[in-house]
């Protein structure tokens, strides 16, 4: 018998608690991650996005108290912010945030003017730089299979952004990227899916492949042209 959370019932309880705590101050509520994609398992986090009209430290404390009243508290995570901060956020960070968030209450469409080609290319570059650093650091120091799995997960999100930049379409499920992206990106996604499904880690070869891929994209993002 599956112990995956009945997310619809849980969200209804969450929304009632949120309304009781913050009333009409709630500007947006959304769901991210595996529950939003229909891929949740028993250990999946419940990634809730809550944007208030404004956010204070006291609001953070109130939200924490509210979460403590809910079931599956250990699985709850996500994003809490004030509206003004979100609208002034680094645009490169907002690309994945916008497209990975399933709206429940309100809309994030005010973010769309910020998500231009410059923001998308910058999102790719920042991410591959971080993956490059993480990969080298892990090859030298931690030598951790779990870290490598996490880096491939991050890389699969970058491939989503690359696919959007190339096609104009956001593909939510990684498996649906496979017939769309180029062979280098396909290898990254295929490795991620293999690891996600419990496949064995070939630490040296997988690390070298990820290193080379991120290195290549650092160079490519340095000379990307804006597409018409």
Role assignments for model-derived ranges:
Residues 52, 58, 105-115:
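Short, polar/flexible loop-turn hinges at active-site or ligand-entry regions and domain interfaces
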Residues 107, 113-228:
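Conserved nucleotidyltransferase catalytic core and NTase-mimicking acidic/glycine-rich helix/loop elements
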Residues 96-104:
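Compact structured core domains
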Residues 1-21, 37-43, 49-91:
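Metal-dependent nucleotidyltransferase catalytic core
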Residues 27, 76, 186-187:
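Secondary-structure boundary/capping residues
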Residues 26-35:
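Short gly/ser-rich loop at a beta-strand->alpha-helix junction or flexible surface loop bordering the NTP-binding
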Residues 13, 17, 96, 209-216:
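Alpha-helical elements of Rossmann-like donor-binding domains used by nucleotide-donor carbohydrate transfer enzymes
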């Amino acid at each position: 018998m599956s112990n995956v959370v009945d997310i619809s019932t849980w969200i209804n309880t969450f929304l009632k608690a949120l309304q009781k705590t913050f009333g009409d101050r709630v500007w947006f509520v959304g769901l991210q991650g595996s529950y939003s994609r229909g891929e949740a398992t028993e250990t999946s986090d419940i990634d809730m996005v809550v944007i208030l009209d404004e956010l204070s430290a006291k609001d953070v404390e109130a939200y924490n108290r509210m979460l403590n009243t809910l079931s599956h508290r250990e699985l709850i995570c996500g994003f809490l912010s004030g509206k003004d901060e979100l609208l002034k956020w680094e645009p490169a960070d907002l690309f994945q945030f916008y497209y990975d968030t399933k709206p429940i209450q309100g809309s994030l469409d005010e973010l769309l003017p910020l998500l231009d080609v410059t923001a998308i290319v910058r999102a790719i570059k920042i991410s591959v730089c971080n993956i490059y650093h993480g990969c080298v650091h892990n090859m030298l120091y931690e030598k951790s299979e779990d870290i490598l799995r996490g880096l491939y997960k991050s890389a699969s999100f970058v491939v989503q952004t690359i696919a959007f930049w190339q096609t104009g379409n956001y593909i939510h499920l990684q498996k649906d990227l496979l017939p769309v992206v180029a062979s280098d990106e396909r290898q990254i996604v295929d490795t991620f899916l293999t690891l996600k499904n419990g496949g064995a880690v070939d630490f040296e070869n997988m690390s070298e492949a990820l290193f080379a891929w991120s290195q290549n994209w650092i160079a490519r993002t340095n000379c990307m042209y804006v597409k018409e």
